[in-house]
């Protein structure tokens, strides 16, 4: 497996589409998925490759002068629990530090709502994120938004 930073907007969108469309349990709302794909073109973007096959990606965005967010991340299901997400995160975290950010944040569905998101929550906690706040209706009442944060200092 190799992690590469992708700089070409079309390539970012191609990889994001390939991965997100293969993950309907997490990215099943077409409008939301298209927004992730569209916005990923202009953001710092890292992709994981198995040979020349893109198997995952992570995209950062700025949410404040001192804070970057893991805007969207996806790894093909057959590559889950193989260190792909951890490697993508390590590359993105390093870039966030280089860009001068003090904090990273990530949003996901609160633990206890859906098994696939419970695994996502455990992944972020294992990376060292801490619980910050839950917004019960930011997305909608069925998907309470859990925000996790991490200091980069």
Regions found by a protein language model. Give the residues of each.
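Active-site acidic-Proline motif in GNAT/NAT acetyltransferases
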Residues: 76-82, 112
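Conserved active-site alpha-helix within GNAT-family acetyltransferase domains
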Residues: 111-134
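Conserved acetyl-CoA binding element of GNAT-fold acetyltransferases
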Residues: 66-77, 105-107
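Conserved beta-strand in the GNAT
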Residues: 47, 53-61, 69-74
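Conserved acetyl-CoA-binding loop-helix of GNAT-fold acetyltransferases
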Residues: 81-94, 98
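Conserved GNAT acetyl-CoA-binding A-motif
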Residues: 96-115
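Short amphipathic alpha-helix that is part of the acyltransferase structural core
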Residues: 1-31
